[in-house]
């Protein structure tokens, strides 16, 4: 489902559309079936439909050919238990098959036609004999959509061809279209909400885009400072199946001296038939309190997956149900899930304030006494049944305590997050909350909640899409975003490559690509607000991806260590998100608004005010184009060499390095090597000053784990560089907090055009004793 809609302009204004229902913006029309937009012709030239050819993967099954007057195979049949897709030939075995839809389309008008492709498995689209959608893939149970546009002429018939490899017995396919809009409408923005009492929106104006986002947070709530350990590395997978797997993984990180703060236990840590019991399976996870204590003894933190879902046989379901706080449609329709034989259950109504209190109480009674540190709120759309048509989705998650589900369709994640945030702060007011949720809504930041981008695929195009996705999420006003590094859903070829390597020790072509994909994704992930790896098999621990000494291993470890060196910088940015309404992951347009060349750049970004990151997202690429915004010069992070701004260059991108540049005037504090975020006090800081322009930065520090910063218990140290004089002023400390360092040393390293200096914690600089 769509999240709330917020539009931000580089003209320094934003619009917040205040609606909880399903919304659209831009062109508010819904996509239509192909036959409603075009005349269709099959491959024989007969009007009224395309030709669908279903070529089985089994020799004893005949090829099926039929006319298709629409391509709308996007949903499970409501009456079938995960076994039939609406409109597809039920008798055809899709596993291993090839499907081709072909013919011609004829528009009644000329202009830009927009299409939305719905796909699972492998898919390509050709229009007018040109490949308009290169191969895309998504695992069959988790379809995706992709939008594209093509110019067509009125009355001109053009060939259309879709090649589809379903990749499983149940799979999905769809292609719908929008007719052109008039030229004068192209640049107009429209908003549409399915159900609301009135048209309601906020117009927010500011001096710059940061000021606009500050206005949004004035309306919807401050962004809390996450626990400091949340800024460290997160190791996850689907899934650690035993207590031993969890503890041995964390132990391996420590023995290899690879920094880590957080490890994650995913779904199904309970007994198979006990979803929602909040009890660990005693056979696989004996003594869960002892397990958590062992994690803490290794200076780690634990996040656990908690769904708003309950099997009907659990006591927790019954407790909700007897109070009328459980959605009933799935129970009435006997909807069973995908686990084992399939179990009956549903989700609780998070729109009821008392139901939210009960949801937390059940967690408090079972999980919280174990010492669990963070909460992973999965499926918070809520996703009661996969691949379900929109109307039935609304039926399944309503009615709510506040009214029809259609009216409150998109706010469930916000309500669910409120349950945990208010619940934990009610029990331990000073312990920082951390939540991770799959969906979001306006105001989520006030509940110390981060959002990740869901079950994305292990594809290069999916990795590229994450760059712009993260940036768009950031300018929506919610600063903490993350993704499944490496992608969640894995192509079978990568699984086969891993298994062949396990058996023979040979790195085949697919496994070689798998390693490079993960390398590039980790490089990118190290510069996101949260640094988190997760996904299905193959396992995502660095030593399971590649052995020590391999370029993949070396690179992942390098950037993990660099992340911890950057902790003084990153945590200062976190402080700014609260006190200054700052945004950590920044599209270039936020900092270089006067440079029109940055307006449409979605594959580079600023990490804070200093670092420009240019991820590599093409297999085998050892260089990429980078645009260097005007108004300042740039320094190569690794060599210190200077580059003039206002130009596009092809830069080196060797396997082990991501292109990374620092702008003139930047002041960046780096801390010592660490194995976890609070291993050492930052008593020695290497302070890099990139000369050429005046610059400033403020170091922010607090206790890192509590809410004393809300009471004024924190400290800041300002740095100001005057380029004309070549002087750096380290200002007086402001503020105080328990445990604060009273004395420290700064090693000030200047980088200039004439004296390039690579990043090196041992670089010779000017030592400043500070007290």
Task: Give the location of each predicted region.
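Catalytic-domain carbohydrate-binding cleft regions of carbohydrate-active enzymes
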Residues: 1-49, 56-68, 72-98, 122, ...
